[in-house]
Structures are given as C-alpha cells and as structure tokens.
C-alpha cells in the first residue's frame, strides 16, 4: 500500500500531473461519500476522474495508495495548522472546532476512510504531526509530576493524541457539528488537566 513509488507521478510538480492527481483525489472524495473503501475499485475511480487506468497507475500503486493520499489532502494541512496554534491554555475548543470545520461536508467520506485499511497509517501521520507540539505542551507541566522523563512525556503525549483522535472520529461518525465536537473535547481536556 505504498502511496509513493520512485518513478510514480503522484508527487510530481508538472502541471498536467497535478491536474491528474487533483482529478483522481476529487473523484475519490466524491465516491467515498457514497461508497465504503472496500466497495471502490480502480475502474470506478478512473471513470469518475475521466482518466485511464494506465494514467492511474502512473500516479499510484493501488486504490489504497490513492485513498491515503485523498485522506491526507483532506486533513493534513488542517492538522498542521492546529498543531501550529495549539496551546491547551488558550482557546483549545476554538482550535478543535476550526480543525473539524475542514471536514464539514465530508463526514461520509471521512467515516469510510476511518473504516478502511488506511486508517492506521493516517493515524500515524496525525501522531507524527501532533507529537512534538503535545510533548512541549506537557513539558511545561512536567514539574507537577514526580519523575517525569522524556519517555513519560512521549507516552502521555501519545495517549492524549490517541484519545483526542478517538473523540474526533466518534463525533464525525455521529454527525456532530464542529462546535459540538470542540465542546466535548474541551470538557475532557479540562477534566484531564484539572481545570
């Protein structure tokens, strides 16, 4: 399920390759709104995108590689922005709400991605984006904990990220508004840090 293979055009900066990639990702988003990943095949995707199978395989090794690229396009920039402005001492609820607003109109597609083989790879990317930020946020509180070392900070950061990610995914499954998801995550944050 490699997304990028040497010689593939999925990461090319050539305008034609970018247009093709955009068409494939757009087609995948559209199909994911009504089809679980397990029901999608390359033939459906290329038909929806208006490209040939040959062109598809010039960009991606398989369907799951494209689904992962689609999921990354849907959330990666939003998570990077969230990590950049993250601070649990400021308006965390607003930050979560802004993050979830990026998925408005794409909940069905997001649920199908959550239920797909690429879900764990996508979660790993979220952890990679959020871990340094969360680690530093927790470091500022480490004086309150006896024996807090780097391993404990990493473990706690991973724990917080996974728990938050679970709440976000459950909110999407339930069709909750970005504001409701933000409120729920904020309530949990307050309890965990005893505010």
Can you describe what each PLM-predicted range is?
Residues 1-18:
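N-terminal intrinsically disordered/low-complexity leader segments
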Residues 1-5, 136-140, 170-195:
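C-terminal peripheral helix-coil segments that are non-catalytic and often amphipathic
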Residues 16-28, 45, 70-74, 78:
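Generic hydrophobic, amphipathic alpha-helix propensity
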Residues 29-34, 39, 76-88:
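Terminal helix-turn-helix DNA-binding modules in bacterial transcription factors
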Residues 31-65, 69:
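Helix-turn-helix
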Residues 81-85, 110-117, 138-144, 171-175:
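Secondary-structure edge/capping motif, primarily at the C-terminal ends of alpha-helices
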Residues 82-109, 119:
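Hydrophobic alpha-helical connector segments
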Residues 97, 118-145, 151-165:
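Amphipathic alpha-helical packing segments from all-alpha helical-bundle domains
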């Amino acid at each position: 399920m490699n997304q990028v293979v040497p010689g593939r055009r999925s990461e090319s900066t050539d305008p034609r390759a970018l247009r093709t990639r955009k068409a494939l990702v757009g087609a995948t988003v559209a199909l994911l709104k009504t089809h679980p990943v397990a029901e999608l095949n390359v033939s459906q995707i290329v038909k929806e995108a208006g490209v040939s199978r040959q062109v598809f395989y010039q960009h991606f090794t398989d369907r799951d590689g494209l689904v992962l690229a689609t999921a990354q396009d849907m959330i990666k920039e939003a998570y990077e922005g969230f990590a950049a402005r993250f601070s649990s001492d400021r308006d965390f609820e607003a930050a979560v709400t802004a993050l979830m607003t990026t998925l408005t109109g794409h909940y069905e597609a997001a649920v199908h991605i959550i239920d797909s083989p690429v879900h764990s790879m996508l979660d790993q990317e979220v952890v990679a984006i959020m871990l340094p930020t969360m680690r530093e946020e927790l470091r500022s509180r480490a004086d309150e904990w006896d024996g807090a070392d780097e391993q404990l900070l990493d473990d706690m950061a991973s724990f917080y990220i996974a728990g938050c990610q679970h709440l976000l995914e459950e909110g999407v499954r339930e069709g909750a508004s970005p504001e409701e998801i933000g409120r729920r995550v904020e309530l949990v944050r307050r309890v965990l840090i005893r505010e």
